[in-house]
Amino acid sequence: MTQFASPVLHSLLDTDAYKLHMQQAVFHHYYDVQVAAEFRCRGDDLLGIYADAIREQVDAMQHLRLQEDEFQWLSGLPFFKPDYLNWLREFRYNPAQVCVTNDNGKLNIRLTGPWREVIMWEVPLLAVISELVHHYRSPNAGVDQALDALESKLVDFTALTANLDMSRFHLMDFGTRRRFSREVQQAIVKRLQQESWFVGTSNYDLARRLALTPMGTQAHEWFQAHQQISPDLATSQRAALAAWLNEYPDQLGIALTDCITMDAFLRDFGIEFASRYQGLRHDSGDPVAWGEKAIAHYEKLGIDPLTKTLVFSDNLDLQKAVELYRHFASRVQLSFGIGTRLTCDIPQVKPLNIVIKLVECNGKPVAKLSDSPGKTICHDKAFVRALRKAFDLPQIRKAS
């Protein structure tokens, strides 16, 4: 299936902020590290028929480059350094790093190359896949239907929060990777800008063009890669946390907790890390149990939870965000990142549950175990066993 009308992507910055944040850290500290990443569809969708169309879009991405106005805008942000931005100015996507195949109806994608370059593929490639699939499956859906659905949800949201103090409710758009389309995401974000509780977007292109705050710190791959970068597997998570602070000592201080599991994370998150990091991000498992563990951990360390922020970003919608806000608002600072339920929330449209995750670093396996067993990713069962042993994990989790 080919012949999509035009390139889906129009800007190098049409990606999530944490990709550039991580890329700068990789550029400075792990310039020669090599990685491999693979696509997974967690649903039952057979997406192999779109392989040719995806390959065309991958080839078109080599023409994307950082424009002068984009360079100047990034230069005005407090956390990017000139050497990295000058390098990014010359960056071009290399389609040779991407292998796209149709395996009897199953879509297979494998990315290989230097981490500093491969890191850029995940978010825009997932956005391309999502937009292509929805273009063919739902040709008559689009911005109008998405905005109608959002307005309906906002009416319910207003009723749900009528008697709530919403002054500490902060919502972010995290919807780039599984959006219905670029146009839908932009329309949704522009509408949400009218709400006082909407504080920003993870999409750097939208943040620049709509004068929003870009949101994001690091992803699972940062912790996964350190499983092989660090000489000691048992201390790899601490090494990842320390390396992040080395690059960003006073900003971008939200740590992702579920690469190994929350319990394993908290064992590594001692007083120095807990004091220096601004807060934590939830991305799998029971959000209430996770939040209670986080608050208890801060209290045990003698840190006032109200000085820290918990970011919830796992499969959220507006109603779930309000429920979590009701539960936690008086005890800790809160932010909520909503993705698919904002940017692909259209009647009769089935969002794709798709990811691209790191599977190797320097030719050796890495794993994401998470707090939701269905999200576990690793080819090498022996490595998963070693990881469990290193982090003293009691529960055996099936690698997929």
Curated annotation (Swiss-Prot):
Transiently phosphorylated on a His residue during the reaction cycle. Phosphorylation strongly increases the affinity for substrates and increases the rate of nicotinate D-ribonucleotide production. Dephosphorylation regenerates the low-affinity form of the enzyme, leading to product release. It comes from the Bacteria. GO terms for biological process: NAD biosynthetic process via the salvage pathway. Its EC number is 6.3.4.21. One of its GO terms (cellular component) is cytosol. GO terms for molecular function: nicotinate phosphoribosyltransferase activity. InterPro entries: N/Namide_PRibTrfase, NAPRTase_N, Nic_PRibTrfase, Nic_PRibTrfase-Fam, Nicotinate_pribotase-like_C. Gene3D superfamilies: nicotinate phosphoribosyltransferase (3.20.140.10). It catalyses: nicotinate + 5-phospho-alpha-D-ribose 1-diphosphate + ATP + H2O = nicotinate beta-D-ribonucleotide + ADP + phosphate + diphosphate. The modification Phosphohistidine is found at H220. Keywords: Ligase, Phosphoprotein, Pyridine nucleotide biosynthesis. Pathway: Cofactor biosynthesis; NAD(+) biosynthesis; nicotinate D-ribonucleotide from nicotinate: step 1/1. PANTHER family: NICOTINATE PHOSPHORIBOSYLTRANSFERASE. Belongs to the NAPRTase family. Catalyzes the synthesis of beta-nicotinate D-ribonucleotide from nicotinate and 5-phospho-D-ribose 1-phosphate at the expense of ATP. This is Nicotinate phosphoribosyltransferase. It comes from Salmonella schwarzengrund (strain CVM19633).
